[in-house]
């Protein structure tokens, strides 16, 4: 039982800061952050990892309570944002409406908006103790008779704010981490939003969007509207100011020009997106939020505390394909909304020629700018369709023509619920790296373990080519990658070696469960005697190969894959070829069984014979004991008669000698009677002294 860890105030502050900067789950994507945090706090790695898990559960339980009060509102907003540590920059041309929701439920911001007098917030425009990061201006081709606008969020860097909760907001293709404050904020730490929106012909006046001084009960909740329904904004209720996309910085207007401002009290995020980059200028159809999106998502998971750990084990191995600081998410309902991009009528919505800005072209904030990452469509991680920046219509994108269209990539049916969570702060976990750091654990069910052990008993005990057919067969049966099966075999071999158990020799060919696996394991080596040393060398070599294969790149795995049709034909051929071998093995098994049975019978007969000998010796011992007692009584009586000098008694005893003495006298006649009498007399004296 582990003891509870007591953290100091400084350690709590460091842990909270790392949590805000992306250390939000226990997978390998946060391994570097957890390691750095452990070194900085001088705590053990497992202690920090346990703290992250406890933090996730606490935030998930709180989000379930607070998520029920939130309402779903808004339409679509597409923004490829760049997540840089401690700084969030958003720059996106958008002429849609000003709600915080993207096309495929990427971001559903539910908030409590209350009017606040603008005079009380004038002091917040000074930016005294804050660092406001300005987003990059992205030039976009303008369509005729259309207004292109730019949305800019200026979010201050707050490094030492106690008790912050992260609300992850997905906008477009990347992830923005907004901090939801529960402590009192000063006037300088404010979030400013200045844009310029033009809906039809009526401009929207400038206003200010600030974080409240203190969390309080809402005074006027926002209007509840279903997702996907266009909402007309009146000028007096709009909270977004704007400026043209000409490269100039946004002008902060006097907030006194407005009678009231909007104040954000709560920000929630529902991570139920599939392909955020498919949002082209807001021309998309949104579906109502499903039941999965009722909880706040912490660290880009489903928000379901019961299913969290099971999903994390499945998702951890997929993070190796993401090539920058990003988090992508997908769920089963997002696959149903893949190709439903339509044009919705409405003011500011008709932008058929709006372009997709690829995240790779923003060179100031993207890591690994000089490298070009090409991902293979078929990898063992099954994440090609969710890790590529693909577009629904390739002709609309002039920035990334080499990326594969999302129409060409599909997830298989058994991978609908797979999600990807990745914060790649280290370059060796990228998709093009030679090795994958920190191979994650695979949790098998009881049925899968029984299947693996059944194949193990049938001869799938080697990592070499001799067991390739069995490995492929069990991988297809369990619907897992061959590398996972090879890793399991290598781990089991090491376990056997550590426990002192001899690893069974491997058997080639397809698996055959018509016989007992133990009986065929020894006879599989009899057809070729020279196969013995090769198998031994293969066993020694496999222990090293098991480690290498578990870290091999996905490109090497894809080269080893065999199509199912050719694999089926190959299995049939091997079954036809190895039929004679199976018969020979059965005959050898019968002979070995006969030999073993005869040996057992021989040992049993030998044991019975030994038992008879023991019983015979025991009977002989009893007979000898009786003879000894008779001789002892005869000698005693004879000695007493000799001492009493009773001739008659002596003659009577000598006339009635025991038969043993008579036989002894006849067979052992002493040539010297004096010696015999002397020996008898000495024996009688000794017995007499013993009796006295």
Swiss-Prot record:
One of its GO terms (molecular function) is DNA binding. It is found in: Nucleus. Residues 3-63, 437-500 bind DNA. Gene3D superfamilies: Homeodomain-like (1.10.10.60). Residues 117-133, 676-692 have a biased composition (Polar residues). InterPro entries: HD, Homeodomain-like_sf, POU_domain_TF. Residues 117-136, 505-541, 647-692 are annotated as: Disordered. There is a cross-link at residues 137, 142, 146, 165, 174, 196, 214, 223, 234 (Glycyl lysine isopeptide (Lys-Gly) (interchain with G-Cter in SUMO2)). This is Highly divergent homeobox. It comes from Mus musculus (Mouse).
């Amino acid at each position: 039982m582990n003891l509870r860890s007591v953290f100091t105030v400084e350690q709590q502050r460091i842990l909270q800061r790392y949590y805000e900067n992306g250390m939000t789950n226990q997978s390998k994507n946060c391994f570097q952050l957890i390691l750095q945090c452990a070194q900085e706090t001088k705590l053990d790695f497992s202690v920090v990892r346990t703290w992250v898990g406890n933090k996730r559960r606490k935030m998930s339980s709180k989000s379930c309570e607070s998520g029920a009060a939130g309402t779903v509102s808004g339409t679509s907003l597409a923004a490829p944002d760049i997540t840089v540590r401690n700084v969030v920059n958003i720059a996106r041309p958008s002429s849609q409406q000003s709600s915080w929701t993207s096309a495929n439920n990427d971001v559903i911001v539910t908030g409590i908006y209350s009017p606040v007098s603008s005079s009380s917030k004038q002091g917040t425009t000074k930016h005294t103790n804050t660092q406001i990061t300005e987003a990059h201006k992205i030039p976009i081709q303008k369509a005729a008779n259309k207004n292109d606008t730019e949305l800019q969020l200026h979010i201050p860097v707050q490094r030492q704010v106690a008790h912050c909760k992260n609300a992850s907001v997905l906008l477009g293709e990347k992830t923005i981490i907004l901090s939801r404050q529960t402590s009192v904020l000063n006037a300088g730490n404010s979030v400013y939003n200045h844009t310029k929106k033009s809906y039809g012909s009526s401009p929207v006046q400038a206003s200010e969007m600030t974080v409240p001084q203190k969390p309080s009960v809402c005074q006027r909740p926002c209007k509840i509207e279903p997702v996907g329904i266009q909402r007309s904004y009146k000028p007096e209720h709009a909270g977004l100011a704007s400026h043209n996309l000409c490269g100039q910085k946004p002008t902060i207007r006097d907030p006194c020009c407005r009678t009231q401002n909007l104040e954000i009290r709560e920000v929630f995020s529902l991570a139920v997106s599939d392909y955020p980059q498919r949002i082209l200028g807001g021309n998309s159809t949104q579906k109502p939020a499903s039941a999965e999106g009722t909880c706040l998502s912490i660290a880009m998971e489903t928000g379901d505390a019961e299913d969290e750990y099971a999903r994390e084990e499945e998702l951890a191995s997929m993070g190796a394909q993401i090539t920058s600081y990003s988090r992508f998410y997908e769920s089963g309902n997002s696959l149903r909304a893949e190709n439903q991009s339509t044009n919705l009528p409405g003011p500011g919505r008709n932008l058929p020629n709006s372009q997709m800005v690829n995240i790779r072209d923003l060179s100031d904030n993207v890591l690994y700018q000089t490298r070009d990452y090409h991902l293979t469509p078929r990898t063992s991680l099954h994440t090609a369709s969710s890790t590529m920046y693909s577009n629904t219509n390739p002709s609309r994108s002039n920035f990334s023509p080499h990326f594969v269209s999302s129409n060409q990539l599909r997830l298989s049916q058994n991978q609908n619920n797979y999600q990807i969570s990745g914060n790649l702060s280290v370059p060796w976990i990228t998709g093009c790296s030679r090795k994958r750091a920190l191979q994650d654990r695979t949790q098998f069910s009881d049925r899968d373990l029984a299947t693996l052990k059944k194949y193990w008993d049938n001869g799938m005990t080697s990592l070499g080519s001799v067991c390739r057919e069995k490995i492929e067969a069990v991988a297809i049966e369990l619907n897992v990658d061959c590398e996972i099966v090879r890793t399991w075999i290598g781990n089991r071999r090491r376990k056997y070696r550590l426990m002192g158990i001899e690893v069974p020799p491997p058997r080639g060919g397809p698996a055959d469960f018509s016989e007992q696996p133990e009986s065929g394991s020894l006879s599989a080596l009899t057809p070729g005697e020279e196969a013995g040393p090769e198998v031994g060398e293969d066993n020694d070599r496999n222990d090293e190969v098991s480690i290498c294969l578990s870290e091999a790149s996905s490109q090497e795995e894809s080269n080893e894959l065999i199509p199912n049709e050719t694999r089926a034909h190959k299995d049939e051929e091997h079954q036809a070829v190895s039929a004679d071998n199976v018969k020979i093995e059965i005959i050898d098994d019968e002979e070995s069984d006969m030999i073993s049975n005869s040996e057992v019978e021989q040992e049993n007969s030998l044991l019975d014979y030994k038992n008879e000998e023991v019983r015979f010796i025991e009977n002989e011992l009893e007979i000898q004991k009786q003879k000894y007692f008779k001789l002892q009584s005869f000698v005693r009586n004879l000695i007493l008669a000799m001492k009493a000098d009773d001739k008659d008694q002596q003659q009577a005893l000598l006339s009635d000698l025991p038969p043993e003495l008579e036989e002894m006298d006849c067979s052992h006649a002493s040539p010297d009677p004096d010696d015999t009498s002397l020996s008898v007399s000495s024996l009688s004296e000794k017995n007499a002294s013993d009796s006295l």
